[in-house]
Amino acid sequence: MSVTMRQMLEAGVHFGHQTRFWNPRMAPFIFGHRNKIHIVNLEKSLPMFQEAQKFVRQLSANKGNVLFVGTKRAARDIVREEAQRAGMPYVDQRWLGGMLTNFKTVKQSIKRLNDLEAQIAEPGRLSKKEILTVQREVDKLNRSLGGIREMGGLPDALFIIDVGYQKGAVVEAKKLGIPVIGVVDTNNSPEGVDYVIPGNDDSARAIRLYARGMADAALEGRAQVISEIVGGEEFVEVEEEEGGVAAE
């Protein structure tokens, strides 16, 4: 689904932060200010958003994984819902230090989570008291790792709501050479972000627009591959039928 400038306006993407909190590195993306609030230039935001979508679409078409990251209160539910819709991994609670740079340890924690769930599922293995204790640990691990437990390995890219709030994620991705798509408000720096989306990172409507747009792009990428495979099969079948008729 393509996003229009009108939709961005309606979602409040253009509302930046108070002028006194601005980051000078965002100057190229600022249109002006109104009532001491910076106004983001949507004529720049829209094509940059579309460029990020194009990247996600191509990545998804090549079976790539985009890790959706949004742990601030306004973003959590939206990021989780849209990532799940697109079949992508996500972090919606807390970014654990080393989540990427120490992925080996993270994989061990995911294995422990799977083992504990298997223990609970096995009838008669644990007492009621033990089940409660284990369940508490499962819940804790699920909060941190539930969204990435099926990821398997490092993601091919990160999509981040509020790069200032998720600075740790940006630093880790940069260290590993993983591309970052990031929503950057006027109070943050675009440094270290490969695909900058200049815009409001606090409004739930704006966050929904970004996350839905990236999820749609991921789904479109996968659908494109499926249609190519199906189309190819249909073409082969037609050729065979024509060959059969000619042979007669």
Swiss-Prot record:
GO terms for biological process: translation. One of its GO terms (cellular component) is cytosolic small ribosomal subunit. InterPro entries: Ribosomal_uS2, Ribosomal_uS2_bac/mit/plastid, Ribosomal_uS2_CS, Ribosomal_uS2_flav_dom_sf. GO terms for molecular function: structural constituent of ribosome. It holds the Pfam family Ribosomal_S2. PROSITE patterns: RIBOSOMAL_S2_1 (PS00962). Keywords: Ribonucleoprotein, Ribosomal protein. It comes from the Bacteria. NCBIfam families: rpsB_bact. Belongs to the universal ribosomal protein uS2 family. This is Small ribosomal subunit protein uS2. It comes from Thiobacillus denitrificans (strain ATCC 25259 / T1). The gene is rpsB.
